[in-house]
Amino acid sequence: MYDDLTSKQIEILKFIKRYIDYKGYPPAIREIGDSLNINSTSTVHNNILKLEMKGYLRRDPLKNRALEIIDSVYEEQENEIKKETIDVPIVGKVQAGMPILAIENVEDTFPLPIEYTSQGIVFILKVQGESMIEDGILNGDKIIVRKQNTANNGDIVVALMDESATVKRFYRHSDHIELRPSNSTMYPIIVKDVEILGKVIGLYRTIY
């Protein structure tokens, strides 16, 4: 997985690949620097030279814009990356009486490290609201959920309430179940029984 490259070299290589795929010819050195916020053209030159030496790029020194991706090496590395990830369904609406991963519920997929699947079937749900902010789960976050229908006290779960999914901490008492928000301004939900859709095992957040 590009073990022999620095993060900057990977960034440059991927930019060149995208540029060629889109425009049909390679970018100029200055375009690479401008697009990747590299102020020094010599830094770009040095990294391109190293990519050539490591077999990822080929360049004709007598021609301008003569960078060429060596596809066999690039594709081999990309395939290795793909083997290490798996596309996980992103669930949109949740409907009562319908399996959580029914095709009608799935809006898209998102690649996650394959290790997540060793914990069972997983799906992603986008958080709406601020009921779990004190656990660091914010509005708009994507939570990674392991599909299961049971929970232990204190688990953060996705539960089905009034035909929609809610994210809360689960507590079973002698005569009721408490779904507790992690927001001191909100009250817990008290119910006799509830359908557990899964346990939250991770979180993904986009930083703009």
From Swiss-Prot:
Record-linked SUPFAM superfamilies: LexA/Signal peptidase, Winged helix' DNA-binding domain
Cross-referenced CDD domains: S24_LexA-like
Its EC number(s): 3.4.21.88
Active site: 131 (for autocatalytic cleavage activity), 168 (for autocatalytic cleavage activity)
Annotated site, Cleavage, chain positions: 96-97
GO molecular function: DNA binding; serine-type endopeptidase activity
NCBIfam families assigned to the protein according to its UniProt record, in alphabetical order: lexA
HAMAP family, alphabetized: LexA (MF_00015)
Designated name of the protein: LexA repressor
Organism field: Finegoldia magna (strain ATCC 29328 / DSM 20472 / WAL 2508)
UniProt gene name: lexA
